[in-house]
Curated annotation (Swiss-Prot):
Motif IAP-binding per record, residues: 79-82
Transit peptide limits: 1-30
Protein name per the record: Serine protease HTRA2, mitochondrial
Compositional bias per record (Low complexity), positions renumbered to this chain: 42-54
Organism: Drosophila ananassae (Fruit fly)
E.C. numbers: 3.4.21.108
Region (Disordered): 30-59
Gene Ontology CC: cytosol; mitochondrial intermembrane space; mitochondrial membrane; Nebenkern
The keyword Transit peptide is annotated on this UniProt entry: yes
PANTHER family recorded: SERINE PROTEASE FAMILY S1C HTRA-RELATED, SERINE PROTEASE HTRA2, MITOCHONDRIAL
Length: 426
């Protein structure tokens, strides 16, 4: 484009050189066409008019070309610059799947799944109404998680542990387009770790629900969510097992066969969808034990929860089940069964070889008693108040005790440590 603009300018100058712009009575001075020959000579008598016609006139030949160039060169450069801006925008075009060719078109099945369902995934923030940011004056974020829209009128599905057991908090939902809305908790089932939220907005993109009963080990799946508050994050993997019983995981009072996957699921992924290659949710991301071992609640189990919740809402009552409210510590935990311990020891050299039981601290809520006391994700609880901890039920029993403080023995890597926590009363 720059060469084309320069060629047009040269052509214009050559055309102008053939015109007689005006006649001068003064003796003409010959100036070479390219401006390189500046020899000045007196014209012979009778040849002034002819030379003026050839050169374009006396005064114009002295001053006109410079003015012409000063005017048209910036004009030409401006045209070139504008053309370069257009070309720059074309450097990052939006490419649709149909426009792709070769292996990109044939094997980008993960991208096709994400394009079809990412708009229905939301980011959930739990705001602490007692603590405010110094600069903005807004409540600080105590924890976060994910969810996905299941009804166009604003019904959102997530994990119960994402939104409950946090006193003095409010729930806020951010959509994929950046809009943010306050949310109300409608239905909670702590036994299955499921909950629904409602935001006051309509015409939303909805996630289609599939069938987890048809899944096979080895199937490709995609986990969507907001790990570490990074919205719309995508990880992929396969189904490792479709029948991982809750008893194997040491989960209290639950009768669920979890989906095990090697798709990366972290704290912010909790509550987000686990999606098959048809773009259907076949599970709700629930927990991660270690790299390559994560679990999701099967969508068939979720459908039962949603049906019961819908029936209760028709009767004008929310669907809430779960454990009696106990003192609040602020952790999400997982019992270390022999199978899980074997996997952890095979993947990490920081795991004590003589460890036979305990409870893994999977998540610590910011600002909670556990956070203030020094517990960290990845810690393994072995004793509370000198009592041996073998599973998560032992931790619940310790919370039900009347002890004001909990003296907790943990393993952080291979190092044994003591932390003291003061649980909050309900």
């Amino acid at each position: 484009m720059a060469l084309r603009g320069s060629h047009r300018l040269d052509d214009f100058i050559r055309r102008c050189s053939a015109l007689t712009l005006f006649h001068s009575q003064a003796p003409s001075r010959r100036v070479s066409h390219c401006g390189r020959d500046r020899r000045q000579q007196q014209d012979p008598p009778g040849q002034g008019r002819q030379e003026q016609q050839e050169s374009g006139g006396g005064h114009w030949s002295r001053f006109g070309w410079r003015s012409l160039i000063r005017f048209f060169v910036p004009f030409s450069l401006g045209a070139v610059a504008s053309s370069l801006v257009i070309k720059r925008e074309e450097l990052t075009p939006t490419i649709t799947a149909k426009a792709m060719s070769g292996r990109r078109r044939d094997f980008n099945f993960i991208a096709d799944v994400v394009a079809g369902c990412a708009d229905s995934v939301v980011y959930i923030e739990i705001k602490d109404t007692r603590h405010f940011d110094y600069f903005s004056g807004q409540p600080i974020t105590a924890s976060n998680g994910s969810g996905f829209i299941i009804e166009q009128n604003g019904l959102i599905l997530t994990n119960a542990h994402v939104v409950i057991n946090k006193p003095h908090t409010m729930v806020q939902v951010r959509l994929s387009d950046g809009r943010t809305f306050p949310a109300t908790i409608e239905d909670v089932d702590q036994t299955s770790d499921l909950a629904t939220l409602r935001i006051q907005v309509s015409n939303l993109s909805v996630m289609r629900l599939g069938k987890s009963s048809t899944l096979r080990s080895g199937e490709w799946v995609v986990a969507l969510g907001s790990p570490l508050a990074l919205s719309n994050t995508v990880t992929a993997g396969v189904i490792s097992s479709t029948q991982r019983a809750s008893q194997e995981l040491g989960l209290r009072n639950r009768d669920i066969n979890y989906l095990q996957t090697d798709a990366a699921i972290t704290f912010g992924n909790s509550g987000g969808p686990l999606v098959n290659l048809d773009g259907e949710a076949i599970g709700v991301n629930s927990m991660k034990v270690t790299a390559g071992i994560s679990f999701a609640i099967p969508i068939d189990y979720v459908k039962v929860f949603l049906e019961r919740a819908a029936e209760r809402r028709k009767k004008g009552a929310a669907y809430k089940t779960g454990y009696p409210v106990k003192r609040y510590m602020g952790i999400t935990m997982l019992t270390l069964t022999p199978d899980i311990l074997f996997e952890l020891k095979s993947r990490s050299q920081n795991m004590p070889s003589n460890l036979t039981h305990g409870v893994l601290v999977w998540k610590v809520i910011v600002g909670s008693p556990a956070h203030s006391g020094g517990l960290q994700p990845g810690d393994i609880v072995t004793h509370i108040n000198k009592k041996e901890i073998k599973n998560s039920s032992d931790v619940y029993d310790a919370l039900a005790d009347n002890s004001k403080h909990l003296d907790i023995v943990i393993l952080r890597g291979v190092k044994q440590m003591h932390v003291t926590i003061t649980p909050e009363d309900p």
